[in-house]
């Protein structure tokens, strides 16, 4: 039986101070680290965003749908289970708290995961996920051999570049030599303006909202085959009803 661990799949960067030139041009990793690692007042104590999310809570309008919306969490779990069989390897990029990933472990999927933030990795590992700290752009060609499905919830909003858009991200995916038939499951909040293809977050620097139509067309342009493209509605504590872009694609 094919066996591979997240340690083999994901190489931990030697330093978070010295990232590759390409990655620096796409994502401000220090900005990401500060946003998630800074403690904020929550109830009677201080907590990081991850600690707040772990309790199913919100910091102002900041939530993760996989803990704040049980319907969303259930939908994503069912979607990924429908795309894989028991024992299949699912690879989560930017696993965060790892709630959907933990549910998939309980459903007898083998879940490997990476996240740039050590705290996220620790929380995911507590849920049985084989998670390690790593940078997506540092993965080596062939690192995801044997993976049947790739899942990224909210990651694309961090990787979107105002000029390069998602081209470097999808080029990196293709460099990993994914097996034909591998499914890609991407999820990200869409812009509030239904006419906008993408839009910068007005509260979180460096994060972008991505529409269903944009993501579908960008994946198609990158050479992937679209299986599903739709919106999943859910509510946030302040902004209210929001649409979550969901797109399922196949590696040809």
From Swiss-Prot:
Positions in coiled-coil regions: none
InterPro entries in the cross-refs: SAM-dependent_MTases_sf
Positions of the UniProt region annotated as Disordered: 1-23
Function: May play a role in tabtoxin biosynthesis.
Protein name: Tabtoxin biosynthesis enzyme
């Amino acid at each position: 039986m094919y066996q591979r661990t997240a340690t083999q799949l994901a190489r931990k960067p030697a330093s978070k101070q010295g990232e590759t030139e390409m990655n620096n041009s796409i994502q401000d990793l220090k900005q990401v680290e500060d946003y998630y690692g800074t403690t904020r007042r929550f109830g009677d104590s201080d907590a990081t965003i991850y600690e707040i999310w772990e309790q199913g809570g919100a910091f102002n309008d900041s939530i993760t749908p996989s803990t704040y919306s049980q319907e969303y969490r259930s939908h994503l779990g069912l979607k990924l289970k429908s795309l894989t069989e028991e024992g299949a390897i699912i690879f989560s990029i930017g696993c965060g708290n790892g709630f959907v990933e933990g549910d998939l472990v309980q459903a007898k999927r083998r879940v490997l995961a990476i996240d740039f933030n050590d705290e996220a990795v620790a929380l995911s590992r507590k849920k049985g996920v084989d998670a390690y700290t790593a940078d997506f752009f540092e993965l080596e060609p062939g690192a995801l051999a044997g993976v049947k499905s790739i899942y990224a919830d909210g990651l694309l909003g961090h990787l979107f570049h105002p000029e390069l858009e998602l081209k470097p991200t999808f080029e990196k995916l293709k460099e990993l030599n994914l097996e034909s038939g591998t499914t890609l499951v991407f999820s990200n909040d869409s812009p509030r303006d239904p006419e906008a293809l993408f839009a910068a977050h007005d509260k979180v620097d460096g994060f972008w909202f991505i529409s269903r139509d944009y993501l579908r067309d960008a994946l198609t342009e990158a050479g992937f085959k679209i299986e599903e493209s739709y919106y999943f509605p859910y509510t946030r504590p302040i902004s209210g009803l929001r649409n979550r872009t969901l797109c399922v694609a196949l590696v040809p």
